[in-house]
């Protein structure tokens, strides 16, 4: 499997915050969700991927080239939407689009014009007078019209209404389908990523908690009702996130569950009474809680 982004043992520190041995592997052509609470290190990691910050150690490869050593050639092929857009407030939408186009030989004017119409952006309006949703649409337009191989999107739909989110996500999905591009998108909202991501990484307090295919995270997080389990258990074929007593039985929250793992309980003299699906948000909360308890 080729990767659009490879991060190995990345370290970074700013004040009291630290990224600790972060490793990520973003498959080429995927929509890769980067999930975590606010302040967990998602934005810092993305800025390191783009060469906007310098790491203390580790290795970053983007589109096959080393970052930051090959930053100019990488950034020519990457579209970026920051969490907070920083554009000249005194320019109109049209002036911003024209200015941006001058920096990218691959700029696709028909795409830009099509998105101006689809997003219903008034090209004579000052950036300062755009609503939050209009600013978000403009930033997505600028990223897509660059025709990059990789889009790095930092909380692009945070705080937007459902209609604007739908418009943006539809445009992104069409872009990936047409261009076979890769999207690396962050959010602190589980449901934002659940619907369309192929892969997901979860970050908390500067560490990667897990990195798995989205379907595996969705299908592999379960609540098990268990009877007769020993107090101390050894290695398990799944990840035990929590164990709690409830009405004479135990309720286990587990990750990386597969149906054939039921036989494990017979081997330890226990009975598996029930397997209950968890929605992704519940699984995410349990994953973070377990990670924090183990620190």
Regions inferred by a protein language model and the residue ranges of each:
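C-terminal coupling/interaction segments
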Residues: 249-295
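ABC transporter nucleotide-binding domain
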Residues: 169-257
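Alpha-helix N-cap/helix-start and coil->helix boundary motif
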Residues: 11, 94, 190, 231, ...
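ABC transporter nucleotide-binding domains
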Residues: 2-7, 12-204, 209-210
